[in-house]
Amino acid sequence: MAKKGVREKIRLVSSAGTGHFYTTDKNKRNMPGKFEIKKFDPVVRQHVMYKEAKIK
């Protein structure tokens, strides 16, 4: 059986407080810290910061 990969699924939650989120994965070995990126939030129709959260 194949080994489990180093990529972990994460959820990017909008900092605008709209509840909108994106899902993606990241390499835990290359990026051990929390992931932050500016993306488009369709609820407020603006680019806002999205922060990493665990997928429940």
UniProtKB/Swiss-Prot annotation:
The keyword Manganese belongs to this UniProt entry's keyword annotation: no
A biological-process GO annotation: translation
SUPFAM superfamilies registered for this protein in UniProt: Zn-binding ribosomal proteins
This protein's UniProt keywords: Ribonucleoprotein, Ribosomal protein
Pfam families noted in UniProt: Ribosomal_L33
Keyword Ubl conjugation: no
GO cellular component term, pick one: cytosolic large ribosomal subunit
A single MF term (Gene Ontology): structural constituent of ribosome
Family from the record: Belongs to the bacterial ribosomal protein bL33 family.
NCBIfam families according to UniProt: PRK00595.1, rpmG_bact
HAMAP family found in the cross-reference section: Ribosomal_bL33
UniProt protein name: Large ribosomal subunit protein bL33
Encoding gene (name): rpmG
